[in-house]
């Protein structure tokens, strides 16, 4: 199982790396926004095209025939486009505001937000052990060293 290593260095606001990272986050959000707006426009046109406006001397209580299957497919497509666009805008906008570029960064920010201290391997190694834990660790090390000699 591979672990993701994140550097704890602060990225300068004026560095090219920071500017490129923020630009990428902005472009993702604007792409999701454009997708949502296009989906909304297509859905609006789809609804408007189904509106029945009778001509002169046509009955206004008999709408034209239509395919239920075609209506269902178009409704599913429009609904999926709108839901996907809105959800992606929410995700990319939140990541842009919180300056998150990867899933590992999101995990660390959520842990910090929920009050869990962010642990580092060096911090764990330098933590003093109590007496019982030290005895168990020494016994395990001795057992492993003994099995390697055989």
From Swiss-Prot:
It is found in: Membrane. One of its GO terms (cellular component) is mitochondrion. It is a multi-pass membrane protein. Signal peptide: none annotated. The keyword Membrane applies. Keywords: Membrane, Transmembrane, Transmembrane helix. The chain crosses the membrane at residues 29-48, 76-98. Belongs to the AIM11 family. This is Altered inheritance of mitochondria protein 11. It comes from Lachancea thermotolerans (strain ATCC 56472 / CBS 6340 / NRRL Y-8284) (Yeast). The gene is AIM11.
